[in-house]
A protein has these predicted regions:
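Active-site flanking residues adjacent to catalytic metal/cofactor-binding acidic residues
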Residues: 6-8, 90, 153-155
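Short, hinge-like loop/turn segments at secondary-structure boundaries
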Residues: 23-25, 76-77, 105-108, 171-174
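Metal-dependent polysaccharide deacetylase catalytic core of the NodB/CE4 family, i.e.
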Residues: 55-139, 157, 192-194
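Active-site-adjacent pocket scaffolds in enzyme catalytic domains
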Residues: 125, 133-209
Length: 209
């Protein structure tokens, strides 16, 4: 029987590559740490959705989001209300598109270590050492440092014709996949069909929309 893993990335507008973390795409930074109206609407919608079913859900949290008190109160409330169904994974210290930048194992390792400490300290028993690369930018060189930092499951591979560049310059998703297998990192890939995404932000783009 096929099982579906329900996951949500907790990105606000200030986190996305258009505004942050990408060497060429980030043109207009959003300096405010306040939650956007759209994100707040999503928080309320997510909470309502949780009340309509009994399925477990994983939230991938960016550590810098924990600097916002409103988000922290909301997330703590979700964990308290649905503690047996909610798990919290790591979506990075910030939302930096790591594979779009030159390889920097030391800085990447430091950022993941800090993120794990901050997120696990907040989420407690609901934290899991699971990782999803910010904006899906995941290169082969990032795999071994993740394992060294204690990550046991990765969910970054989105093997779509629209996301090939996110594996890093000259790399392929198969190389990321092979590296995960070599070091024993369990990979849970994004669902695709006909090499196109069936979920995620790409569904807002024509013709998938």
């Amino acid at each position: 029987m096929t099982q579906t893993w329900l996951t949500v990335d907790c990105d606000d507008f200030r986190h996305i590559p258009k505004h942050y973390g990408h060497p060429t795409r980030s043109k207009s930074p959003i300096l405010s740490q306040e939650l956007s109206p759209e994100f707040k609407l999503g928080m309320r919608g997510f909470e309502h959705w949780l009340s309509t079913h009994e399925n477990p859900v994983t939230l991938f949290v960016i550590a810098d989001s924990l600097e916002n008190q409103e988000f922290c109160l909301w997330l703590k409330g979700i964990i308290t209300e649905y503690s047996n169904r909610i798990t919290i994974g790591c979506h990075g210290l910030t939302h930096k598109s790591w594979s779009a930048w030159p390889e920097d194992v030391e800085q990447f390792s430091q950022s993941i270590t800090q993120a794990m400490e901050q997120i696990s300290g907040f989420a407690g028993e609901n934290f899991r050492p699971w990782f999803r690369a910010p904006a899906g930018y995941m290169a082969p060189w990032m795999v071994a440092p993740l394992v060294d930092c204690g990550i046991t499951v990765d969910s970054s591979i989105n093997d779509s014709i629209l996301t090939r560049v996110k594996a890093g310059g000259g790399n392929t998703w198969q190389q990321v996949r092979d590296t995960c297998q070599q070091v024993g990192l369990l990979e849970r890939e994004w669902l695709t069909k006909w090499r196109l995404p069936v979920n995620g932000p790409a569904l807002s783009l024509f013709p998938l929309s």
